């Protein structure tokens, strides 16, 4: 089973393909998408990154065994299982057919139509109208194919469904309003069936379909464009004027700034996004440096080094401890699927890593398991309400604030951080644990 790290930027629909595939196959995929671990536009241009991934593109996957692969479809294929890839030569060929169709037929018109509504690309009326007609053709083609089928290939979800759904995602979210999509009931049924599968929801969350077709906003587009400073012209000195014309031209040529590197569509999307406000900016400075504890936890012995460091430096006024327990243990069946619930939550909380740490454990066996963990948050309240992006999963858990000075808390922190102990409050053996750091 594949295991490794996926480098990407936040909310990259191309990365969703591999992450959803991993939900089905059970592949263990860690995501690095935000500083300090990964800074898109910088990290992926470093010599170290380019040695592994010469194209400098993301998503890029580095296996725990050192195997490296880029291109989203290749990564999704690698982390999949036989069922997703197509269990017969004929099914496998059809999966490749739809994956190729998504890239060649869906991406171009979808980008032409959707990107201007996001302020990423300038609007061209004729190009947009052509793209709309092309999208109609594609949805109609899918509608005919799905008239007698639940999924694109065979009777179960495959990479074909995962890839095409992810490619259509922004169309359904941004421009396919009810009056436009109603002509394609079979495509809509299939799309809704897929996005409501637990494995899709674990990565995509709740997908809200477009209610009103988004339009190009010229002001938003103008604001998204990088502003260039125009140097002020100054009168040249007498000596400057006396220089030979050819010499002055050479100096100007030498002083001319290097042309800006052309941004790809993903970088343009990031540049277009307004800088997010730090949800924790209102809190006073704390003496507890979470990153330093994380380094101790990752590189030193937990019981003899990391835990003593934690309690010695923990700032109970600037940080808080919480115990979380999954509300619906009766719904947990296969342990690998239960583990994927934890992984999916961690992935959606990626931007919270700088201000949180957690150890979450899956206890028990198939059809008899539970999930609980200990969390460390900046501030005295739960962090999830501070950002809509963090609110997908937390209501599925009960949360209890812990007293850092109590013996119970000391025991919980020791057992959950080390994955060792009696866990008397659980009544089940440790199956496996996950660390959010």
From Swiss-Prot:
Name of the molecule in the record: Elongation factor 1-gamma
SMART domains hit by this protein: EF1G (SM01183)
Region (Disordered): 221-268
The GST N-terminal domain, residue ranges: 2-87
Organism name: Mus musculus (Mouse)
Originating gene: Eef1g
Its biological purpose: Probably plays a role in anchoring the complex to other cellular components.
Cross-link (Glycyl lysine isopeptide (Lys-Gly) (interchain with G-Cter in SUMO1)): 253
EF-1-gamma C-terminal domain residues: 276-437
PANTHER family: ELONGATION FACTOR 1-GAMMA
Residues annotated with N-acetylalanine modification: 2
Start-end of Basic and acidic residues biased regions: 221-254
Tree of life domain: Eukaryota
Residues modified as N6-acetyllysine: 147, 212, 401, 434
Pfam families: EF1G, GST_C, GST_N
Assembly and binders: EF-1 is composed of four subunits: alpha, beta, delta, and gamma.
Lineage, highest ranks first: Eukaryota, Metazoa, Chordata, Craniata, Vertebrata
One annotated GO molecular function: translation elongation factor activity
Keywords on record: Acetylation, Elongation factor, Isopeptide bond, Protein biosynthesis, Ubl conjugation
